[in-house]
Design a protein with these regions (language model features):
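N-terminal signal peptide c-region/cleavage motif recognized by signal peptidases
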Residues: 12-14
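Domain-level detector of nuclease and nuclease-like folds
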Residues: 29-33, 43-210
Length: 210
């Protein structure tokens, strides 16, 4: 009997997931990455052009991710045409690289219910929806700070954004991302339990814009 129950549990979730079509989800997660920190932990080692000082990147768009209240869809069979090279290159001003734009479409955009043009347009609108705290661009040296300071700055800069609607992540001792939860019409909403996992680092590194 226990074996039967275990088998049901193991196979129930994928079956339910298959019933969810592209465009059928609960809310979005907008992921903003602090580019200088990504470059320090990952990009410099890759020789990424995103890290060239001429770009002056601060908070860039990592992606706009369809989300369930528990879990998330990815790599959906949408039947939509993939983006053209010109479409992915057009996103580099806010995403840093055409490769990231392509990957985000393939992994997350295919689950949005939009075609590539619509998904990128919505991603750009979501990015513009958020006021990115200006104080971080004024840094002229690397500092250590609690992750909660970054969260507080976003809360102060964005009227209507509540603590349960944002989470700050860290990677390799650096502030990595601000993740903000939005409705389909880009209003602030609470994040699900699997999204709200704040970084607890009290001395996270934050490097200045290059």
């Amino acid at each position: 009997m226990r074996l039967c129950v275990l088998i049901v549990l193991l196979f129930a979730t994928p079956a339910l997931a298959q019933d969810r079509r592209a465009g059928d989800f609960d809310y979005y997660v907008l992921a903003l990455s602090w580019s200088p920190n990504w470059c320090a932990t990952t990009g410099d080692a890759r020789g990424s052009d995103q890290c060239n000082a001429r770009h002056d990147h601060g908070w860039i768009l990592h992606g706009l991710w369809p989300q369930y209240h528990r879990g998330w869809p990815q790599f959906c069979q949408s039947g939509k045409q993939p983006p053209s090279r010109s479409q992915t290159h057009a996103m580099t001003d806010i995403m840093g690289s055409p490769g990231l734009a392509w990957h985000q479409w393939k992994k997350h955009g295919t689950c949005s219910g939009f075609d590539a043009s619509g998904y990128f347009a919505l991603s750009r609108a979501a990015y513009a929806r958020i006021t990115r705290p200006a104080a971080f661009r004024k840094l002229n040296e690397t500092v250590r700070l609690p992750a909660r300071v970054v969260e507080a700055a976003f809360l102060k800069a964005n009227k209507g954004l509540e603590p349960d609607g944002i989470t700050i992540t860290c990677k390799q001792g650096h502030i990595a991302e601000a993740r903000i939860c939005l409705s389909g019409d880009l209003q602030f909403v609470p994040c699900g339990a699997d999204v709200v996992r704040d970084c607890r680092d009290e001395r996270a590194l934050f490097t200045p814009v290059r």
